[in-house]
Regions:
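Substrate-binding pocket helix/loop in short-chain dehydrogenase/reductase
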Residues: 96-97, 101-107
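SDR active-site lid
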Residues: 172-237
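Active-site loop immediately N-terminal to the catalytic Tyr-X3-Lys motif
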Residues: 98, 146-150
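Active-site helix of classical SDR
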Residues: 120, 155
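Conserved glycine-rich cofactor-binding loop
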Residues: 11-15
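The beta1-alpha1 cofactor-binding region of Rossmann-like NAD(H)/NADP(H)-dependent oxidoreductases
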Residues: 38-39, 59-70, 102
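Residue(s) in the substrate-gating loop at a strand-loop-helix junction
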Residues: 139
């Protein structure tokens, strides 16, 4: 990768955001790290410096556009601009549609979808000037829509749709766009879980813990795919296979999801 090697990462205080920062830090990049978890941010910044990078950390709640604007201004002042923006901050949620409240929906959409929209909006002038890149973190849930997590599915599907829109709109401005859609991997995402169905949280937690893939693995794969110019980045092999099947025979996937929904409902009633 060329450019000036300056990256901003939201949700950098832990998990995937931290590992993305560290992966680019090992290449000598300067990192602007943001999160609502200030203690986690301090840890990430120390790790970034140990890995060979540098930069600064600034608290930022992606629900607040003014905080994102302030972060963009800090990137301008401290780094002279930005080359890659990673909209990674996100939260977990789940529950059957009839049990989810509108407040559950508002919370999920405000962070996982509108946080990405606002991040793109706040940083577009900087990446447009540097002819840089935007990396939005979505999920395989955006493509496969598992039952019992409709608000999460919708938010992440919105991130994919936004990224597709930006891909075509910004090509002429020489701004690259990528969207990352990981499946389950070892992460602390469930610390943020909100939802009315405890059994779904337990089921998802078990899947996360059982995954052989770590956040560092995802970050490594992301680095390689961005370097190759891949738009939709699917780091899990089973995710790539499932997406291919859905494109060829969507009804087969829907039928499978109906069975899965009944299994989840039965477990929630047990």
């Amino acid at each position: 990768m060329t450019m000036h090697n300056r990256m901003m990462v939201t949700g950098a205080g832990s998990g995937l955001g931290r590992e993305i920062a560290l992966r680019w830090a090992r290449e000598g990049w300067q990192l602007a790290l943001s999160d609502v978890n200030e203690a986690g941010l301090a840890e990430t910044l120390a790790l970034v410096r140990e890995a060979g990078g540098d930069g600064f950390a600034q608290r930022c709640d992606v629900r607040d556009y003014s905080q994102l604007i302030a972060l963009a201004q800090a990137c301008e002042t401290k780094l002279g601009g930005i080359d890659v923006v990673v909209n990674n901050a996100g939260v977990a949620s789940g529950g059957f549609f009839d049990e989810l409240s509108l407040e559950d929906w508002d919370w999920q959409i405000a962070i996982n979808l509108m946080g990405v929209v606002k991040g793109c909006k706040a940083f577009l002038p900087l990446v447009q000037r540097s002819k840089g890149k935007i990396i939005n973190v979505a999920s395989m849930a955006a493509l496969m829509q598992a039952p019992g997590m409709s608000n999460y599915n919708v938010a992440k599907a919105g991130v994919v749709a936004l990224s597709e829109s930006l891909l075509v709109e910004l090509r002429g401005l020489e701004v690259g766009v990528h969207v990352l859609c990981p499946s389950f991997f070892q992460t602390n995402l469930m610390d943020s879980f909100r939802g009315p169905t405890p059994s779904i949280k337990a089921q998802v937690s078990k899947l996360l813990e059982a995954s052989p893939i770590t956040a560092a693995d995802i970050a490594d794969y992301l680095y390689q795919q961005v370097a190759e110019g891949v738009f939709m980045i699917l780091p899990h092999e089973e995710g790539r296979m499932a997406w291919k099947i859905k494109q060829q025979n969507p009804q087969a996937i829907y039928d499978e999801m109906v069975v899965l929904a009944e299994k989840k409902r039965n477990k929630s009633r047990a």
